[in-house]
């Protein structure tokens, strides 16, 4: 070997040793970033390693790492919004291995007369998780961040993602109301910033959740156990919508999006002109005793036209800042959503009476009078604005003013083909309808809610705290000129051959209706809390009360116009809607029915409440909160009913004592066991007490009639929950609940006064409702799974009729008692989501599945003929990508599986696969009475935040 070659090899070996040494001296820098005060992980904190200039972001569990860093001393610089910057020095050696644990402090602004600590961002997932963990009651929370990256844009649709919650959908397929733990929507209460708000619904107390744009919220809290300081009229739960609050520094957020419904890929959107619609009825414009001319009912809003709708529009803007040396905080947030939704619907109209069963061992079969084939086209404008001003006088006294205005305008065109089932005539082999009515209905449904709340917080002494609220709220609904035009044709079977002929169309009666109502609340709240010690343990005694005065006014006036006969006194032949001629028969029909319409009423309600409670901690493990609340209810109303009819007016008074006890045992700082007992009530809806009939929306098939003999409902509630809050966003909860319900209110079919069938509320004895809840969320790096499952079992003793043929040949009516679940309760509901969340790529995505088990929609008068909503599986998708620090692009897809809404009767379908089979039937195991399809919808858009 030559010396030159030996030298090369030695030099190569030297460099290999040097490189290997450098590699061996390299190590990873790992660590976690936490909040100094709460010990929560900080997600998305910016970490810079100098002098290398390497950058990274903390992950979902607050962790970060820099790979293969050579031995030496480095400086870490950590920044996070709302926190003071942190700098620390780290030395890398061969043995470096233990992760760093870094704590950041929230920024503190020093004022001349007041110290204001930077408030936590209530819109984050971390805040929601921490609040669930530290709350005094059992609660589930969804943050604004989770809402933004979910497939949903309204509060109602977000609700279906929460444990124990299912939703009821409207004609457009969007959610409207929440059912919590199997308790129908009537048993739940909606709050804005902890304050109860009135409902624009013309019959009920519950608030339509689709009126709330999700962009206005910081978070949604579903409170499942009540403390004494909370109002007691909630059995299922309380939905607290926490609006955005004034920030600690300037913020600007905006959203612009668009979308489309797949329904209108296949058909046109039907619209109608609104310029000629009068907001008030002729009787309101001219006076109650003035006969309205036919010209007061222009035809323009009945002439529907079809075309492809424009894309949907979704806009929002939020601005906030602090002024006057940070004493004054201001935020203004607004949202506007314009969408075109709809559905294709098929309905079998059920007859008021059903034929008898062949004997006592067989079931009765349902009977149907009509088949409705409908197309709904709805233009929905949803807008909202909320503002808050808060002023800190000093460290002991502050005041705030919240104002919220919400509006939901829905203009719906409903095209109906109504086939009259007159029966079957087998001799001529004809099976089908005996008349066809083509109907056009146009409806404007205008709802609004405003709320103004003035609140103050005062630290009277070091131990004594006070807070108070003065509240004014109003909810309105206007449904001006619900117009329906109908054309009828006779169907005449031909002899023996099974064919038929259809007569030329004739003009039928025209209906025009005006509905409007207002619900006004004036409320005052006051609370005192005194901090003390008992037996060496910390305690807080609380006392307070509230008063609410509610006034509800309801107006309803219906006009029926009769077509003018031709010169031969025959039916008027249909040419066109503008060419159709009408008159009033009898002549006083021109007054409408307002004079005797019980839908015109004035309702007063006064509620006084007081409570006392004690929060007591035993060491660091036990926490108790218990006390007693009393609520005194005074109601009176006066309607336009005849004085000879029960329910024209009433005075109703009752008092309730509502005890409550919440307990919590903490195994450590992440694991706890909660338990609670509380008593709650449900006050009947206003219109449920007044016996007038009305169709509440364009989708209603049956009249709803009130019952003046209803009693209010009382409920005893028990809860138990075990919870684990893991690292990052991981969590696990499992719990059980039980409710004993005295005098539950359910809607049942009953014959009306006109030979038809109507829905009527009634008390149904006692009921038991119990169940289990499971919640989980777990991330594996950037991927995760989340979900919840709720099992609910309820039992109510119901009374039904059973009509059958006796062995003697006669018929008999028996009153039978049978057990069934509560109306609206699904035995099983579940959510499951596949998640992707990367702080490095700034991509969030989720594929979300919701399962809702079958549930009773309407209770039948007859045994075994209840209407059930068939179980559903809904699949949605959303994803977003953040660009830089300020811009986000998102996409959302809803109802990917095109899941229909179906009502069924769980009786054997005797006519299935037979000559007399009814339309849109799917199985011999049940009878389908309604089948609605909505199709998928798509949204894309941009958000920015400064």
What are these regions (language model features)?
Residues 67, 167, 195-224, 244, ...:
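Short acidic/polar hinge/loop motifs at secondary-structure boundaries
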Residues 737-740, 760-856:
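Gram-negative outer-membrane beta-barrel transporters
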Residues 851-858, 881-946:
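C-terminal beta-signal and adjacent terminal beta-strands/loops
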């Amino acid at each position: 070997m030559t010396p030159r070659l030996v030298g090369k090899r030695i030099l190569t070996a030297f460099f290999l040793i040097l490189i290997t040494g450098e590699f061996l001296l390299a190590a990873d820098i790992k660590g976690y970033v936490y909040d100094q005060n709460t010990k929560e992980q900080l997600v998305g904190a910016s970490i810079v390693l100098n002098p290398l200039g390497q950058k990274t972001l903390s992950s979902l569990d607050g962790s970060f790492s820099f790979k293969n860093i050579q031995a030496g001393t480095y400086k870490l610089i950590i920044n996070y919004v709302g926190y003071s910057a942190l700098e620390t020095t780290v030395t890398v050696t061969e043995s470096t291995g233990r992760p760093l644990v870094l704590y950041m402090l929230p920024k503190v602004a020093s004022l001349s007369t007041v110290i204001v600590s930077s408030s936590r961002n209530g819109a984050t997932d971390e805040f929601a998780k921490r609040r669930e963990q530290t709350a005094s009651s059992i609660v589930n929370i969804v943050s604004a961040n989770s809402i933004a990256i979910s497939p949903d844009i309204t509060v109602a649709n977000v609700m279906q993602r929460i444990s124990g919650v299912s939703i009821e959908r409207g004609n457009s397929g969007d959610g409207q109301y929440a059912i919590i733990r199997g308790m129908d929507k009537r048993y739940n209460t909606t709050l804005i910033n902890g304050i109860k708000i009135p409902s624009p619904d013309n019959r009920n107390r519950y608030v339509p959740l689709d009126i709330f744009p999700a962009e206005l919220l910081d978070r949604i809290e579903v409170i499942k156990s009540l403390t004494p300081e909370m109002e007691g009229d909630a059995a299922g739960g309380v939905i607290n919508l926490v609006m955005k609050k004034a920030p600690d520094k300037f913020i600007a957020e905006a959203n612009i999006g668009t979308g489309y419904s797949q329904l209108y890929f296949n058909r046109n959107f039907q619209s109608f002109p609104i310029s000629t619609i009068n907001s008030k009825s002729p009787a309101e414009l001219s006076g109650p005793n003035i006969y309205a001319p036919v010209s007061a009912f222009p035809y323009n809003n009945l002439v529907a036209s079809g075309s492809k709708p424009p894309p949907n529009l979704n806009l929002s803007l939020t601005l906030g800042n602090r002024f006057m040396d940070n004493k004054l905080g201001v935020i203004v947030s607004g949202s506007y959503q314009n969408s075109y939704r709809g559905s294709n619907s098929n309905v079998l109209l059920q007859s008021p009476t059903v034929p008898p069963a062949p004997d006592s061992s067989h079931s009765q079969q349902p009977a149907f009078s009509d088949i409705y084939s409908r197309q709904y086209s709805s233009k929905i404008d949803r807008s909202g604005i909320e503002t808050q001003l808060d002023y800190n006088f000093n460290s002991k006294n502050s005041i705030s003013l919240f104002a919220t205005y919400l509006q939901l305008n829905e203009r719906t065109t409903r095209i109906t083909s109504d086939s009259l089932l007159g029966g079957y005539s087998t001799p001529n082999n004809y099976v089908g309808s005996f008349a066809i009515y083509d109907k056009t209905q146009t409806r404007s449904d205008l709802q609004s809610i405003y709320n103004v709340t003035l609140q103050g917080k005062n630290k009277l002494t070091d131990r004594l705290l006070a807070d108070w609220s003065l509240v004014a709220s109003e909810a309105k609904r206007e449904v001006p000129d619900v117009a329906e035009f109908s054309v009828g044709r006779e169907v005449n079977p031909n002899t023996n051959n099974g064919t038929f002929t259809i007569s030329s169309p004739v003009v039928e009666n025209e209906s025009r209706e005006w509905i409007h109502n207002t619900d006004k609340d004036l409320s005052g709240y006051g609370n005192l809390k005194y901090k003390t010690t008992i037996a060496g343990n910390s305690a807080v005694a609380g006392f307070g009360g509230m008063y609410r005065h509610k006034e509800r006014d309801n107006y309803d006036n219906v006009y029926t116009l009769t077509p003018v006969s031709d010169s031969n006194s025959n039916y008027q032949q249909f040419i066109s809607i503008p060419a159709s001629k009408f008159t009033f028969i009898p002549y006083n029909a021109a007054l409408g029915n307002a004079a005797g319409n019980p839908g015109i009423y004035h309702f007063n309600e006064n509620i006084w409440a007081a409570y006392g409670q004690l929060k007591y901690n035993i060491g660091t493990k036990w926490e108790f909160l218990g006390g007693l609340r009393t609520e005194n209810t005074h109601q009176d109303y006066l309607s336009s009913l005849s004085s000879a009819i029960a329910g024209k007016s009433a005075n109703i008074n009752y008092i309730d004592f509502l005890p409550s006890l919440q307990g919590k045992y903490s195994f450590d700082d992440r694991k706890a066991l909660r338990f609670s007992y509380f008593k709650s009530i449900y006050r009947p809806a206003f219109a449920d007490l007044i016996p007038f009939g009305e169709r509440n929306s364009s989708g209603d098939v049956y009249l709803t009639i009130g019952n003046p003999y209803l009693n209010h409902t009382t409920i005893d509630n028990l809860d138990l929950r075990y919870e684990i809050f893991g690292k990052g966003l991981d969590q696990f909860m499992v719990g059980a609940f039980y409710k004993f319900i005295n005098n539950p209110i359910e809607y049942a079919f009953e014959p009306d006064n006109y030979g038809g069938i109507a829905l009527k509320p009634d008390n149904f004895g006692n009921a038991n409702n119990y169940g289990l809840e499971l919640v989980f969320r777990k991330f594996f790096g950037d991927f995760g799974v989340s979900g919840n499952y709720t099992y609910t079992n309820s039992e109510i003793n119901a009374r039904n009729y059973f009509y059958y043929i006796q062995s003697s040949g006669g018929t008999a009516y028996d009153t039978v008692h049978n057990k069934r679940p509560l109306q609206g309760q699904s035995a099983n509901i579940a959510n499951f989501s596949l998640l992707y969340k990367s702080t490095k790529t700034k991509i969030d995505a989720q594929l979300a599945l919701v399962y809702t088990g079958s549930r009773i929609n309407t209770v039948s008068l007859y045994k075994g003929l209840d209407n059930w909503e068939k179980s559903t599986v809904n699949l949605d998708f959303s994803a977003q990508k953040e660009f830089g620090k300020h811009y986000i692009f998102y996409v959302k897809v809803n109802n990917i599986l095109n899941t229909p809404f179906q009502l069924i009767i769980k009786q054997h379908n005797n006519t299935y696969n037979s000559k007399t089979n009814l339309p849109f039937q799917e199985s011999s195991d049940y009878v389908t009475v309604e089948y609605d399809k909505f199709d998928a919808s798509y949204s894309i858009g941009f958000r920015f935040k400064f």
